[in-house]
Structure formats: structure tokens, C-alpha cells
Design a protein with these regions (language model features):
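Conserved GTPase G-domain signal focused on the G5
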Residues: 220
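N-terminal Rossmann-like NAD(P)+-binding domain of SDR-like oxidoreductases, especially those catalyzing
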Residues: 1-216, 256, 266, 285, ...
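C-terminal substrate-binding subdomain of Rossmann-fold SDR/epimerase-dehydratase oxidoreductases
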Residues: 2-8, 24, 34, 63, ...
């Protein structure tokens, strides 16, 4: 037995979003034991948590969520009463090349966790009382929205963090009630896992919650994703491979704001409910690239526009969804959450972090990463 008030597993806790959730909860809840369960694939990095690794309420467990028997043992050994499930393969390009890995991790891994939690919690005298299975998903399961105004219209959403660039590229937004229509192997695998989570509530009464978030950005993101990749490329004077014309639109959410939302929903969200988590920030990809160029050049002391010549338009991604835009007013209305940072402020923090932590970047971009990068972009 232990003296901790709660014992919570965060799967994928060494990854990008997961490490921010682990850090927040370890520091905020010293009476909780936070178990970071991670397989440590290419995107998992324990260096992301160097500042909490010696905390008494932090535990790292090296395990694969698809290993059902191991998961069963971990749940019992640590008397787990909460699971925050972030472990997933998440890069669309990788899913196009290798959909089987995405199905294994995102679908079968989620099912393994659900079944292990079901069996363990049902074996306890109190059953599901005080338990919670929180599954983090993506807005990509909803499909794509049309761009109905290429120049942007004034957004109907207003928060204290609304930026000067506060506009939308259409009047439609993803709601929690939007029908699923995934277009990539990645989003199809996440949609399937979402359905399994809801089915375990409907069938067995498991206390589950699902959230769907927009694009995250911030420190510790593996540089296969646009923002850290381009920051690093600008710094090293490498090409900036922009898919197609760069007109695709995404909503952006600062990762620490997402971690705050996860903490809030885990504790106060309604069982069996769904919450969208968005940043109220729609940007065209090409405009993001220009903001990154301007910010990195300024912080490196380069004349404005120095790196604009690095922009290289490459063959578009297969099945590239045109626009994602998320309506998270339900979360704002019911639980009082909203983003804390204007996008421009978040980008400034993010760029500064990557420039100040070049050793971290060098470590994660060595070896196999370079082969992946060449394979992805060299012949496009």
C-alpha cells in the first residue's frame, strides 16, 4: 500500500504533450503518484522530464501499451485509479507510409488499456467508484472543413488571449456532436480508438472521457512537426518544405494550455462526455512559416526577411485536409477553461525555447531522424 491520494498513469508521458501533463501534475499534486508509462519510441524522450525525475511522487515505467499482461501487472502493482491516455503514433505522413503501426498502437494499444483497466477495476470491492479513464484524441477524426473566405473573417470566438490575427477562414467549426469522417490512416486509427473508449462506457459502465484537440505547439515537440522542424531548419539555413501552396488552415493550441485543460477535465469533466480543446487560432500554413521566419531571424540577429528564400513548395500530402477549426466553447462554458496565451506570444516563447535548447534538438535529430527526414522530403 502507499500513502498517495491517487495513483494516475499517464501513457506516453515521455512524449510531447504527455511530458507537459506529467510535469504539471507531479508539481501541482504532491499527494498524487504520477506513473509515466512510455515505450520510448523515437518521439519519447526522458530528457523531456529531467526537472521532475527526482520528485518522490514521480515514477517511470518502461512498457508497451499493447503488452496486455504487463499492463495488467502495472495497474495492480501501483493500485492505479486513473489513466490519462496520450500514448499514440501521431504523425500523418508516417501513417501514410506505415498504417499497420498506427492501427497496432492507436487501436489495439487503447483496447489493451481499456480491457486491463476494466478487469482490474471490476475486481476491486469498490468497482469503478473513484476511477477514470481519460482518452486524448484529435480534431482530425472529424474530417475537413471548407475554406469559405480565403482572406479570413472576424472570428465569432473571443477570449482574453485573442490575438490581433483573430479571424476564421469559414463559418463552420467542429463541435463535439460533429460526425466522424477521418481521411488519413492516422485519423482513422484515432477515430477507432475513440469508439472503443465510448463503447467501454456504454457496455461495461467504465467511467470514460474523450477530448479532441487541435494542433499543439510548444517546447519538447519532436521535430517532424511543422513548427519545431522549421525553427531548426531556419537556424541551420535549410530548406523549408511547404506542402502545396501552403493554404491549408489549422487551429493552434499552446501545449501548456492543453495540459491545463487535461488536468481540469480529468478532475471535473463529466463521465461519458466529450470536450473539444482548441486555441481559437486559425492560421494558414504559409502564414505560420512567415511568422516563424520573422521571429527566428529577429532572435538570431538577422535582417528581416533573411530566410524567406528557404521556402520551398513541395508535392502536397496525399489526402491533405484543407481546414481544421474547433469550437471549444463547451469547455469554456462548463469548466471555465480558455487559452492563456495569444498565439504570437506562444510562438515567441516556443522559438526562444528551441534556440536556447539546441543540445536537446541535436540529440533528437541525430541518427535515424536524418534518414527519415531525407526519405520524407528529399525527392518532393
Amino acid at each position: 500500500m502507499n500513502n498517495y491520494k491517487r495513483n494516475i498513469i499517464v501513457t506516453g508521458g515521455a512524449g510531447f504533450i504527455g511530458s507537459h501533463v506529467v510535469r504539471l501534475m507531479v508539481n501541482k499534486y504532491p499527494d498524487y503518484r504520477i506513473i509515466n508509462l512510455d515505450k520510448l519510441t523515437y518521439a519519447g524522450n526522458l530528457a523531456n522530464l529531467h526537472d521532475v525525475e527526482d520528485k518522490p511522487n514521480y515514477v517511470f515505467v518502461h512498457a508497451d501499451i499493447c503488452d496486455f499482461e504487463t499492463i495488467q501487472k502495472i495497474l495492480a502493482d501501483y493500485n492505479v485509479d486513473g489513466i490519462i491516455h496520450l500514448a499514440a503514433e501521431s504523425h500523418v505522413d508516417r501513417s501514410i507510409k506505415d498504417p499497420f503501426t498506427f492501427a497496432r498502437t492507436n487501436v489495439m494499444g487503447t483496447l489493451s488499456l481499456l480491457q486491463a483497466a476494466k478487469e482490474y477495476w471490476e475486481s476491486l470491492p469498490e468497482g469503478y467508484e473513484g476511477k477514470r479513464f481519460y482518452h486524448i484524441s484529435t480534431d482530425e477524426v472529424y474530417g475537413a472543413l471548407e475554406i469559405t473566405d480565403s482572406e479570413g473573417i472576424e472570428s465569432q470566438f473571443t477570449t482574453k488571449a485573442s490575438s490581433e490575427h483573430h479571424h476564421a477562414y469559414g463559418k463552420d467549426f467542429f463541435l463535439e456532436t460533429t460526425n466522424y469522417n477521418p481521411h488519413s490512416p492516422y485519423s482513422a486509427s484515432k477515430a477507432s480508438s475513440d469508439h472503443f473508449v465510448r463503447a467501454f462506457h456504454d457496455t461495461y459502465g467504465m467511467p470514460t472521457i474523450v477530448t479532441n484537440c487541435s494542433n499543439n505547439y510548444g517546447p519538447y515537440q519532436f521535430p517532424e512537426k511543422l513548427i519545431p522542424l522549421f525553427i531548426n531548419n531556419i537556424r541551420h539555413r535549410r530548406q523549408l518544405p511547404v506542402y502545396g501552396k501552403g493554404e491549408n488552415v489549422r487551429d493552434w493550441l499552446y501545449v501548456e494550455d492543453h495540459a491545463r485543460a487535461i488536468d481540469l477535465i480529468f478532475h471535473q469533466g463529466k463521465v461519458a462526455d466529450t470536450y473539444n480543446i482548441g486555441g481559437f487560432n486559425e492560421w494558414k500554413n504559409i502564414d505560420i512559416v512567415r511568422v516563424l521566419i520573422k521571429t527566428v531571424d529577429r532572435l538570431l540577429g538577422n535582417p528581416e526577411g533573411t530566410s524567406l528564400d528557404l521556402i520551398t513548395h513541395v508535392t502536397d500530402r496525399k489526402g491533405h485536409d484543407m481546414r481544421y477549426a474547433i469550437d471549444s466553447r463547451k469547455l469554456q462554458r462548463e469548466l471555465g477553461w480558455e487559452p492563456s496565451l495569444q498565439f504570437e506570444e506562444g510562438i515567441e516563447r516556443t522559438v526562444r525555447w528551441y534556440l536556447d535548447n539546441q543540445e536537446w534538438m541535436d540529440n533528437v535529430t541525430s541518427g535515424a531522424y536524418q534518414h527519415y527526414y531525407d526519405d520524407m522530403y528529399k525527392n518532393r
